[in-house]
């Protein structure tokens, strides 16, 4: 950055939000695509760097892609193809043979990086997200004794829709090379098993959620992703009252102004335009709120090279301009659009300073912003308005749920949120905070690790071996959006215990029992 030297910028995406605290606790190696302008300047001779810079706790291994590879693998097949295929948001997927070939090539390259990072021939490999559907098969071919856990962070489509992809069989066979395939919800698991039943020589046991195929056995489970708890960003932030004052001062608002917040990537799945229409209806139906209520939409620029994303950006800009022109005055704007990257500390300041948070996803695997809002409110105040089409709605029962396509319903829920008594706010927030605290990121990772350990110990799968056979384990976390890690679990256990709010959680049991996690590798796209 001009005049500032090298600056560390952390992604606000859900995958990084979930994985980064686990990496800090496990002291691992994260294999990731390097996209920052200074990434090559900071790596060592093995394309690695220790992070975070101030207090390094894990290693980041970079994989480099050129422009055509980035366009074909990431922008093309992964996002124009798979992202659109897996989300019901009105955008048709685009599939090109050249994009799939590049996707396969890049998956093979990340898999090779995993093989280079691991020690021994029986690692535990955790592969993350839709960017790496083929990687489990490539890793299996190179490390046949490995235990592979693939986690798919976004929704899995229904079988008929999946078959629109010309390479749907290759995707399924790639994932079925895993010992365990994880999803956000049980609905996703059902859709995946329905899809697998279309493959020859695959037998699905619905009672156990197990697929048997070509001598292999793959377990299919739901592991709802979550946040670290206690939340480091909350402990490092100002008190809630100070955050309220700070954000209103920054926005030039009077202290009594009611404030709503939305935090999204500029993505067509996030329902930002529908959200703005609901706010417009709210101001129509409640004239008394004009001048007394402001909604801040943090909109992270995303995939700007794709037409669908440019279109949604223009729709958001036009809606904001129209609503502000209709209800605004010389000193008042009902909508404040902040179209830029915000560091996590900035986001949490707004979450802690707002009266309500509106998550209006049209289709979302989980949506961690909803959980971040809950995590941020240690004052047990604030109201979460949450789309029923986000996976988080299945866990956060204290939220006011909406169908974002029903504008009138959404406006009514927003009015209810603004009028909710403090005691009801506290009751709802307390119940949601209990869920997020108990089922946190360490619980999420720990369950996957524990299930993998149990699979190996029991020898239940012909494509895994019992963990007890070796004292040195390797954890490969995530081929897709982030990278791999090397973890030593004797040290990792103590670190995890320090960061957890509960004592006997799955990651601790896994570490104490079946694992001594040594140098895990987590392949991902970019942290």
Where are these regions (language model features)?
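Catalytic cores of carbohydrate-active enzymes across secretory and cytosolic contexts
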Residues: 1-473
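Short, N-terminal intrinsically disordered low-complexity segments that are rich in Pro/Gly
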Residues: 5-9, 509-514
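Conserved protein kinase catalytic core
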Residues: 159, 394, 505-507, 512
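Intrinsically disordered/low-complexity terminal segments and short unstructured peptides
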Residues: 461-463, 487, 525
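Short, basic/aromatic recognition patches
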Residues: 478-486
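Short, acidic loop-to-helix structural element flanking the phosphoryl-transfer center
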Residues: 510-526
């Amino acid at each position: 950055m001009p005049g500032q030297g090298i600056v560390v910028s952390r992604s606000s995406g859900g995958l990084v939000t979930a994985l980064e605290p686990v990496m800090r606790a496990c002291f691992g190696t994260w294999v990731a695509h390097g996209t920052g302008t200074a990434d090559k300047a900071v790596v060592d001779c093995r394309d690695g760097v220790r992070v975070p810079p101030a207090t390094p706790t894990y290693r980041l291994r970079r994989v480099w892609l050129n422009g055509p590879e980035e366009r074909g693998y990431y922008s093309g097949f992964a996002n124009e193809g798979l992202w659109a295929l897996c989300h019901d948001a009105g955008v048709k997927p685009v599939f090109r043979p050249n994009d799939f070939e590049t996707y396969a090539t890049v998956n093979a390259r990340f898999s090779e990086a995993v093989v280079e990072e691991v020690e021994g021939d029986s690692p535990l490999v955790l592969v993350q997200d839709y960017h790496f559907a083929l990687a489990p098969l490539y890793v299996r071919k190179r490390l046949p004794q490995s235990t592979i856990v693939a986690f798919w962070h976004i929704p899995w489509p229904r079988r008929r829709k999946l078959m629109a992809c010309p390479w749907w069989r290759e995707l399924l066979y790639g994932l079925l090379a895993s010992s365990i395939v994880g999803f956000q919800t049980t609905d996703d698991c059902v859709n995946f098993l329905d899809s697998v039943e279309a493959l020859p020589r695959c037998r699905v046991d619905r009672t156990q959620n197990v697929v048997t195929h070509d001598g292999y056995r793959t377990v299919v489970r739901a592991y709802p992703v979550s946040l670290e708890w206690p939340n480091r960003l909350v402990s490092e932030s100002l008190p809630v009252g100070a955050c309220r004052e700070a954000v209103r001062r920054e926005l030039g608002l009077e202290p009594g102004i009611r404030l709503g917040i939305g935090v999204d990537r500029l993505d067509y799945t996030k329902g930002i335009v529908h959200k703005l229409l609901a706010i417009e209806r709210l101001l129509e139906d409640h004239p008394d709120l004009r001048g007394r209520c402001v909604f801040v939409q943090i909109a992270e620029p995303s995939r700007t090279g794709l037409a669908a994303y440019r279109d949604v950006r223009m729709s958001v800009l036009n809606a904001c301009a129209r609503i502000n022109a209709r209800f605004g005055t010389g000193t008042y704007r009902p909508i404040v659009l902040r179209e830029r990257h915000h560091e996590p500390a900035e986001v949490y300041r707004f979450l802690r300073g707002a009266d309500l948070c509106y998550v209006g996803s049209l289709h979302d695997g989980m949506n961690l912003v909803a959980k971040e809002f809950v995590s941020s409110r240690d004052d047990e105040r604030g109201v979460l308005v949450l789309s029923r089409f986000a996976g988080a709605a299945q866990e956060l029962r204290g939220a006011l749920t909406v169908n974002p396509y029903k504008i009138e319903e959404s406006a009514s829920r927003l009015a209810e949120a603004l009028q909710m008594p403090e005691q009801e706010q506290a009751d709802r927030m307390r119940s949601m905070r209990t869920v997020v605290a108990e089922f946190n990121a360490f619980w999420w990772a720990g369950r996957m690790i524990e299930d993998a350990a149990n699979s190996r110990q029991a020898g239940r799968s012909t494509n895994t071996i019992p963990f007890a056979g070796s004292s040195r384990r390797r954890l490969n976390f995530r081929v897709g959006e982030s990278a791999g890690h090397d973890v030593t679990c004797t040290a990792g256990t103590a670190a995890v215990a320090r960061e957890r709010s509960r004592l006997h959680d799955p990651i601790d049991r896994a570490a104490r029992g079946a694992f001594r996690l040594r140098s895990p590798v987590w392949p991902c796209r970019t942290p």
